[in-house]
Structures are given as C-alpha cells and as structure tokens.
Amino acid sequence: MSESAFSNRIVQSLLDTDFYKLTMMQAVLHNYPNVDVEWEFRCRNGEDLRPYLDEIRHQIELLCELSLSPEHLAFLERITFIKPDFLRFLGLFRFNTRYVKTSIENDELCIRLHGPWLHVILFEVPLLAIVSEVRNRHRYPDTLLSQARDRLYDKFEWLTTHATADELAELKVADFGTRRRFSYRVQEEMLGVLKNDFPGQFVGTSNVHLARQLDLKPLGTMAHEWIMAHQQLGPRLIDSQIAALDCWVREYRGLLGIALTDCITTDAFLNDFDLYFAKLFDGLRHDSGDPVKWAEKCISHYQKLGIDPMSKTLVFSDGLNLPKALDIFRALRGRINVSFGIGTNLTADIPGIAPMNMVLKMTACAGQAVAKISDEPGKTQCKDPNFVAYLRHVFKVPDLPSPEKPA
C-alpha cells in the first residue's frame, strides 16, 4: 500500500529546524539577550493562502507544546561548540504565541513576529514549513511518498549519466530544504534515499531533527538575519558587517567558519573581509547572483590576500538543482573547494506540483529598520525604502534596475 505524504503533526520537535538557527540563537543568548526584533511573512507569487489561516493557527498551537527531551539535549551536547548554558536555556525553551500574530490583511495571509530576538529566532523555519504543508494538504491531498521518491531516483539517474565517476566522487551535496519542504514525511523520505543511494557525496542536512534521527551531520553557520541585525546593534552602519563577523569569531573561535556574503552585496562584503577574517573563516556562501562570477570574485579576493583558494570552501545554496550544481562544480574544480546546499529541488519537487515561494524575514531590530540588498535586485527586502537608500549610500552600492524593467 502506498504511503501518504502527510502526517498529523507538521513540526516534529524543537530540533525540526535549520541548524544555523541554533548556532545563531546561542550567539544571541551570549551577546544580545534583550534585543527586540520584528519579522514579516511574504508570499512572493501572490498565492491566496487565506483559506488556511485556521489550520495554520492550530499548527502554531501544536508548535508551542513542544519541548526538548533529554535525548534531544544529549544529542546537542555531543556538538563541541554548543555551550552548557545554552543547553540549559534550550531545556527550558518553549515557543510563545504572544510573539506571533496571524491575520488576514489586504486579502492576504499576514504573519508577524515581534519580541526578543532570543525568543523569536526559532519561529522562522517551522512557521514556513507549516504554511507550506498546510497549503499542500489542501491543494494536493492525494500525494504519495512514492511520487517524490521516484522523482529523486530519476535525478540520480540523470546525474550518473552526465557525470563521470571521478566527478561524482568529489561532488558534495547537502539538504537545505526544511523551510519550503512539501511535507515533513517527504523530507524524511528524501533524506533516507539520499543517505543510502546518492551517487555523489551526500554530506548532511540542515535539519537537526532528521540529522539526529538518520545519523547525518547537521550543517549550517549563519543566515542573513545575523548580519542584518548588526545594522542596528550599536556600531556605525559602515562597520556593521565587521561587527557581525567579529562577534561570530569571538563566539565560535574559528569553528562554524562559512560566512554569508550577499546581505548588502558581495562587493561590499569583500571590502570588509580583510586578511584577518579571510584567514579565520573557512569559506563563503553564495545565495544570490551569478554563482560562477561570484566564485571568480571570491577566488580573486583570496589570491590578492596571498591565500591559496584550495585551502578554502565555497558553499552554494541559491535555487540549486543537480544540473546547476554539476555545472558550477565543473567551472571551479581544482581551483577552490565547493559544496552545494539544495533545498526546494530535493524536498518539494514532485511532478505536477508547484512548490511554495515565500519568505519570513527580519524587518526591524531594536526598533529600527534593517535591510537585505543582495546581489540580485528581486531579493532586496526592507519595509523602509529610505533606509535601503541610506544603506546603498553608506556602502556605495549603486541603484540597480528592477527585474521587471531591465535597463
């Protein structure tokens, strides 16, 4: 009998989230425990999510029932950089509905978070997973696990046909697909298949719950929110990226060394990524713009600093699939180490089904606007256009034409 792609509970545990939310949460506990933040949900393609409001609220109530078991805490304790005080805090942590507001505004589903960063930070990934799975239950109720599994094996067949054995031996792929997964059961099934049958190197998952369950490595370092928040955390705006990186280094002392470059733009980031940081961090992560051009820029930066690029790693995570990953791998092979984090294309790619296109992003920190500009015009996000203009001015980022009106 074929198995349904859905289960009653969408979020399985407090660990059913991306690993970098926990690594950032620990840094927030130690450095910014009293800072307030605001987040807003946005459905990028205008899909009507209003009919799902009541069920989304019910799943949020279930989310707030979760706590970490002794087994969960024991798993985290084995991770060397998770500190005892953070483990004690997590043992007491519960999601609190006072910090999340759901409503219908202007005929759209509205989700807002407002509260202490320390207590709000873990909401993002499970909330997105809830919206995605509730919507999929209604739109595609008869979906079976076998459909997702067969699709993944088709991708493996393509990869083994188009890549050599030597290439496959070096091709490193990880799952980054929790937030927009079709369902929990689909992600769980996909990870089992990837662990056992992926023809290249399957190196782990960002999902901590499934890493524990399937004996995989949990992966992740920092997200845009870490750098965005520092725009309002005390230093001059021009020094905000440096402050974010410096705080990370003090927290992790050389561990978790993959830095995200495109919060403002990669050019602005590399201006701040001097020899000190370039030596301390293991590598960089790409999340917008042309991946090969970005990689060339990073390689050139390392070479100018006298650093061998082959001692560093570039992680790619922007809308990838296996053909794109293989193209990037071939363009950079032997010049710098590369790894690929694939999300929606692994956990929400089922024939005939359109995955969600949505984000839940930090909009304010300490009562003031924050922004992400990125290397791609369509990914710029801020509720205050004046702050975006000021950010561009301070970091000397030129205005770019919108994707709807190319120059």
From Swiss-Prot:
Any GO BP: NAD biosynthetic process via the salvage pathway
This protein's UniProt keywords: Ligase, Phosphoprotein, Pyridine nucleotide biosynthesis
Post-translational modification: Transiently phosphorylated on a His residue during the reaction cycle. Phosphorylation strongly increases the affinity for substrates and increases the rate of nicotinate D-ribonucleotide production. Dephosphorylation regenerates the low-affinity form of the enzyme, leading to product release.
One GO MF term attached to the UniProt entry: nicotinate phosphoribosyltransferase activity
Enzyme class, first EC level, given as a word: ligase
Keyword Ligase annotated: yes
EC number annotated for this UniProt entry: 6.3.4.21
Pathway entry: Cofactor biosynthesis; NAD(+) biosynthesis; nicotinate D-ribonucleotide from nicotinate: step 1/1
Domain of life: Bacteria
Gene Ontology cellular-component annotations: cytosol
InterPro entries registered for this protein in UniProt: N/Namide_PRibTrfase, NAPRTase_N, Nic_PRibTrfase, Nic_PRibTrfase-Fam, Nicotinate_pribotase-like_C
Catalytically driven reaction(s): nicotinate + 5-phospho-alpha-D-ribose 1-diphosphate + ATP + H2O = nicotinate beta-D-ribonucleotide + ADP + phosphate + diphosphate
In-chain residues carrying the UniProt-annotated modification Phosphohistidine: H224
Protein family membership: Belongs to the NAPRTase family.
Function: Catalyzes the synthesis of beta-nicotinate D-ribonucleotide from nicotinate and 5-phospho-D-ribose 1-phosphate at the expense of ATP.
PANTHER family hit by this protein: NICOTINATE PHOSPHORIBOSYLTRANSFERASE
UniProt name for this protein: Nicotinate phosphoribosyltransferase
Organism taxonomic ancestry: Bacteria, Pseudomonadati, Pseudomonadota, Gammaproteobacteria, Pseudomonadales
Name of the encoding gene: pncB
